[in-house]
């Protein structure tokens, strides 16, 4: 139905898993390889969407949240959010960050059709860029190999990037030129290296900028990367619940004892007086 077969190449930033000793897909699509399936899924009606929003808003409000952040919106989602907030008195605010794609229109064109002003409690805050996948999914991009490689991979496997550095750098330059806030998904330390290198170039080109980009997840941020982050006004947002849900697996499977002991280095960020935030990435884990 999706047209994925033995001849279909891996897309940039994704992987089509294959059967052993064969090019025949085994049904598992990683990262950007999932996009073709997502486009084929049936879409709920506006009434169904609004009913879901009502439940989510009340659940989050009961937990004390007064602002919701959508970290990977698109134009259709944003129009839905605008309509929802215009249709009723929503007791929370929402900020959406639009996921931008490097191979489509220039960034200014992608952002031109939506205001960043607050409308009925909803606004577009900036853009979201994905640099890698997830460590527990073996798609986070690490500088050193995974402790135990996944099936079909050798001991050198480190995950892979969503974007090559030159494409990220192009997006960063456009964002800095137009003063557009940035959230950048970075689980693995190799992805964080690429982000830091790109931010150095952008800060050199636009030394008077006031942007404070955010490294989302920042699971494996190293000590040297914390130092660089402070100098570049990069704010890590740590997904600290990883320790509760996957701590033993990070230690025994994904990262090994040394790297797992340094996951989500909040204390080291504190020592440096580095501004950081924490999040739970709902619905990956519960918002409470």
Describe the residue ranges of each PLM region.
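A post-motif C-terminal structural segment
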Residues: 254, 266-270
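Short beta-alpha connecting loops at secondary-structure transitions
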Residues: 209-212, 217, 246-258, 277
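Short acidic/histidine-rich active-site segments
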Residues: 135, 180-190, 238, 269-288
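Non-cysteine beta-strand/loop elements that form the S-adenosyl-L-methionine
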Residues: 119-139, 233-244
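Glycine-enriched alpha-helix->loop->beta-strand junction motifs that scaffold or abut catalytic
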Residues: 200-202, 229-237, 272-274
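Histidine/acidic-residue-rich catalytic or RNA/ligand-binding cores of hydrolases
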Residues: 77-82, 192-200, 227, 246-253, ...
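Flexible, glycine/threonine-enriched loop-and-boundary segments that flank and lead into catalytic domains
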Residues: 107-112, 214-217, 222-223
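Divalent metal-binding segments
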Residues: 1-109, 125, 129-191, 204-207, ...
